[in-house]
Each structure stands twice: as structure tokens, then as C-alpha cells.
Design a protein with these regions (language model features):
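Short histidine-centered beta-strand/loop micro-motifs
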Residues: 31, 49-55, 96-98, 117-118
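Conserved short histidine dyad/triad with adjacent acidic residue
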Residues: 40-55, 89
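Short acidic-glycine-tyrosine-enriched beta hairpin
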Residues: 74-90
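A short hydrophobic beta-strand segment most commonly corresponding to one strand
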Residues: 86, 100-118
Length: 120
């Protein structure tokens, strides 16, 4: 068993062409410590988000702080702390804090899932 204190996790800048604005990542469990999952926190500063993309596995988002948006090709939904979102494998989507408040979420995916960016 391993207990992780989120308040003690280092925040690293998430520099990637997938993100717009200032985004930070906190790895909850090192990929070498689990056989099944990628598990981290993504912290979106106000005005930041990721671009449209899709994954080869389902993705679960658990909003831990703030208010943000999760969008697909068909809809945009406002989400806030306590909301849980299931994004099926292959669904084109984006998520983040495009408005005036920051938003953080835990992301859970199957280990080995691939991400395809679909927005320049």
C-alpha cells in the first residue's frame, strides 16, 4: 500500500504543444509503481486549457478545485470541484479553465494509452 499526500506532491510545469496557457502537473503515482494506470493531477491556471485531442483508452477526470469546462465536438459542460467525468476512448475532447478561474482535476487513464492532438 502507498499513501500519497497531494499537498506534498511537487508541481511541475506541463510544457507541451497540447496545452495553451500556464498548466502544471503533479504525478500522484510514478508510472513504474503501477501496472495498470497513469494517475496525476493537472492544474490549469485561469485562461488555460488543452487542445482538442483523443485517447486510446477511457479517461476519468475528477475535478478537485475550481470551475472549468469539458468539451466534445457536440457539447461544452461547466464542471466544478466534486464532479467526475468519463471520456470514452476515441472521443474528441478538451478540458481546462478557459474562463477567469483556475481549475484542477485528477486524471486517470490506462497505462500505455496514447494521445492524439486534433487541434493545431
Amino acid at each position: 500500500m502507498k499513501v500519497v499526500r497531494i499537498s506534498e506532491l511537487p508541481r511541475e510545469s506541463a510544457i507541451s504543444p497540447l496545452f495553451t496557457g500556464e498548466v502544471f502537473r503533479q504525478v500522484i503515482v510514478d508510472p513504474d509503481e503501477t501496472q495498470s494506470f497513469n494517475f496525476s493531477i493537472v492544474n490549469f491556471s485561469a485562461g488555460s486549457r488543452n487542445k482538442f485531442h483523443q485517447h486510446t483508452s477511457d479517461q476519468i477526470l475528477i475535478v478537485t478545485e475550481g470551475t472549468g469546462v469539458v468539451a466534445t465536438d457536440q457539447e461544452e459542460r461547466t464542471v466544478s470541484a466534486g464532479d467526475v467525468i468519463l471520456i470514452p476512448a476515441g472521443e474528441n475532447h478538451w478540458h481546462g479553465a478557459p474562463g477567469g478561474t483556475p481549475m484542477s482535476h485528477i486524471t486517470v487513464q490506462t497505462k500505455g494509452s496514447q494521445t492524439q492532438q486534433n487541434e493545431p
